[in-house]
């Protein structure tokens, strides 16, 4: 199948909200051009999007079909290779970070994963950001990642 180029992946996700991704984000950028914090966060996100590596085509196909369309993971029907993936078997510490504004992995989709794992050492945190903002924004650098780092440190 080959690789899925990052431009195609970005296109697939951007058509979920075409006006927001194609026009509105640039209008917001121009309206906030004097806000250094906003511009810094915007540029970090754009850089992250621009540096997305290609994804193996078969992996992309299985991910879209199995996770998005058929919801196999939460239904306890997912396999990786020949191995069954059961969330009930996950008994290690789990830190579930949910982006409230995520249009790719909505809170309604990510929160059930948190409750499906059998771990007794788990935490669920909601953040007022979007999908990419969880990793590639000023908010992420100042809040999301430090909280995750502290949580990991406490368990190492």
Residue ranges and their predicted role:
Residues 107, 124, 128-143:
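Catalytic histidine-centered segment of alpha/beta-hydrolase-like enzymes
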């Amino acid at each position: 199948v080959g690789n899925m180029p990052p431009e195609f992946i970005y296109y697939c996700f951007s058509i979920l909200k075409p006006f927001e991704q194609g026009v509105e984000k640039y209008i917001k950028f121009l309206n906030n051009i004097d806000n250094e914090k906003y511009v810094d966060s915007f540029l970090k996100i754009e850089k992250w999007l621009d540096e997305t590596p290609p994804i193996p085509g078969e992996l992309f196909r299985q991910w879209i079909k199995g996770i998005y369309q058929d919801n196999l993971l939460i239904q306890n029907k997912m396999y990786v290779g020949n191995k069954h993936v059961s969330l009930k078997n996950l008994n290690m510490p789990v830190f579930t970070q949910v982006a409230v504004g995520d249009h790719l992995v909505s809170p309604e989709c990510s929160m059930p994963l948190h409750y499906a794992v059998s771990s007794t050492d788990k935490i669920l945190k909601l953040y007022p950001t979007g999908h990419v903002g969880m990793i590639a924004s000023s908010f992420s650098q100042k809040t999301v990642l430090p909280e995750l780092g502290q949580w990991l440190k406490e368990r190492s």
